[in-house]
Every structure is written in structure tokens, then in C-alpha cells.
Amino acid sequence: MTKVNPHFAKKLQKFGAKTVFQCFSCGTCTAVCSLASDDQQFPRRFVRYVQLGLEDKINHSVEPWLCYYCGDCQKNCPRKADPGELMMALRRYLTSIYDWTGLSVRLYTSKVWEIISVIVLFLATLAVVYALHGPIVLDHTELETFAPRHIVDPAGWIFGGVLSIILLSNIYRMYRFIMGDQKVKIPASLYVQELATLIYHFATQRRFGLCKDNRRWIKHWLLMSGYAVAFILVNAFSKWFLTNEFLSIFHPVRLLGYYATIALLYVTTESIVSRLKKSEPIHQYSHSTDWMFLILLWLTAFTGLLVHVFKYLDLPLPTYYTFAIHLAFTVPLLALEVPFTKWAHLAYRPFALYFVRLRERALEIQRADGGLSSVEISG
């Protein structure tokens, strides 16, 4: 028996869904959506789910992750019910129920929690740097002397390990919600065989390209690739970044670093300007966590660039101070965004497509064996 929560629509307002009852279920949004299909129909179906309070059905659905907010539904809705923003609010809500720590729901529904969390992590990072930094050399810039790699590297690995464990455990909870009540048994071998689907969609973000205006795919790929390159460089090639030596600006590692910085600064700056101007349908409404993500990412990339400039100019104190501030922005960005809010979408979206593909393949196998003739892909 389907459970109904009559207060669900009000609950979802805190996640950004403000106009759900303006929808009269005409279906225009689903008709113009280039990503909807016969098996995965949205946004209208989910607007209706919210109106009816079908919280449990939403909790076990994969479709909100298959929506990439192209913006066509926003532009064509005759009631201005903002169906794209509703799907965005559902993704925030689902992120909060996958998270077992309870921090995600607090960050999404309380600006006070959000701001205090950033401030506490920022100040705590500065305090740690103050307590553990090495000698301050003023004759010339010695960044590794100020921030010894034997401290920075293990701290980064532990920090990254903790965040990875939290995110992976949340992904497992996502799996349990979406795949827990299966009508088709999925062979264990399929999980390995379909890993290519997961890797492909994570690396290419190709589903963005299915939107009628695929410029967002290019921007999103630049953002994702810039972050991925920066992450790999910092973790695998730190000896070239956290060093007392002055590498040539044409060193391959430096060039990759420039690409990552330019990509991150370009996309975040463009997104901030677009949100301020409300120039695109997807930027007409901004949740506080959208701003937190963009501002922290921009400041992290910009201070990282300043560290490089000051070091290249051999300005010791500006280099050390800016490096400390850079870390102080990086920690809340990663600690809050990766497992709990906006950045988690980078994991949930490709995993959602992976889960859908697993269901499709399992159904094909069962049909070939004379089993079920159909299955509800959306769960």
C-alpha cells in the first residue's frame, strides 16, 4: 500500500520547490523534455507525486537524477510552475536522504548551519596551519619548508579517505533505495560488465549533450575536468606543487595546473554572472547551497592561482599566507560539497545511469530466458 505524506510539498519548499501547486498537469514539460522517455517520464509525473505526497515513491525513484535541467520545461511551462527547479529540489532532497549523517539536510534547509559550518571549517584549518607550519623563510620563497610534505600529504590522504568513505556509503544507500525492491534479479557479473557505463558517463558527462542547447555540456565538462585534473595533480604530483623549487611555467605539470585553474575560474565566473543576471532558465532561481558551492570553488581556484603567482615572483610572506587561506577555502569546499551537497551530484548522476543500465540488461537476460515480460524501470 502506497504511503502518503500530505506535508511533503511543504517539506520540499525548504529544498527550493516553491511553485509546485501552480502546475495543472498539462504535460507540456514532459512533452518538450529531450531527456524523458517512455520508461523514464518526467518532470510532470514527479510534480504530481509531490502534489499527492508520494514521498516513499520519490525516495525509491531514479528519474530525478536523469534530469539534467536543460531548461526547456522552464521556458515552455504555461503556468510558470518551474518544473526544472522542482526536479532540482528533488535532487537536493534525495541527497539528504542518502546521507546517513544528517548533515546534508541541515545544510540544505538551514542557512545558519551552512554559514556556521563554512566559518568553523575555515577557522579550524587556519588554526591547524598555524599550529603545524614549518619554519618561515623570508630570504626567498620555500613553500615546502613552510608546509612540510610529510605533514600535508598524509593529512590530505586521511581527509580524502574519510570523505570517500562517507560518499561511498551514501552511494550504497542510494543503491538500496533505488535497487532494493527489484522484480528482476541482477546477476553479479553485470555489475562488473556495466562498469564501462559508469566510467563513460562520469568522464564525459555526455547526457548533458542531449539537451537541445548543449553549451551547458561543454561548460559542465570543463568544470568537471578542471576539478579532476586539479585533484589528480594535488594528490599524485604534489612534489611538483608543494616544493621549494621553481618549475618552468612550461613544465607539463604546470600546464595542466593552468588548464585546471582557467577551467574552474571561467565556468564559476560565468555561472555567478548568469545567476546574478538570471539570464538562463536554470539560473533564475538559486538555492543558498548553489552560492556556497560557486563562491567556495571560485575562491579556492583564485587563491591557488595567487599562490603560484606569488611564488613565481618570489614573495615569501604573500605566498605562505595565501597558501594558508587557500587551504582554509579548500577544506570546507571538499568537506561540505563532496559528500553532502552540490558536488555529490557528480557521483550520483553517473551511478543512477549505471543502475538504470543494470536493470535494462537484467531484464533483457530474463526475457531471453523466458522470464518476466516487463518491468518498471523506475522502481
Where on the chain are the PLM-derived regions?
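Flexible metal-binding regulatory segments at protein termini and peripheral loops
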Residues: 1, 91, 95, 379
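Ferredoxin-type iron-sulfur electron-transfer modules and their immediate structural context
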Residues: 1-64, 346, 360-363, 373-377
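Iron-sulfur-cluster electron-transfer modules
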Residues: 20, 37, 47-239, 243-246
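Secondary-structure capping and boundary motifs in well-ordered enzyme cores
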Residues: 22-25, 59-62, 66-69, 258-261, ...
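Hydrophobic alpha-helical transmembrane segments of multi-pass small-molecule transporters/permeases
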Residues: 28, 32, 72, 76, ...
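Hydrophobic cores of alpha-helical transmembrane segments in multi-pass integral membrane proteins
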Residues: 116-130, 155-173, 193, 197, ...
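Helix-loop boundary elements of multi-pass alpha-helical membrane proteins
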Residues: 207-209, 277-281
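Charge-dense polyanion-binding interfaces
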Residues: 250, 260, 361-379
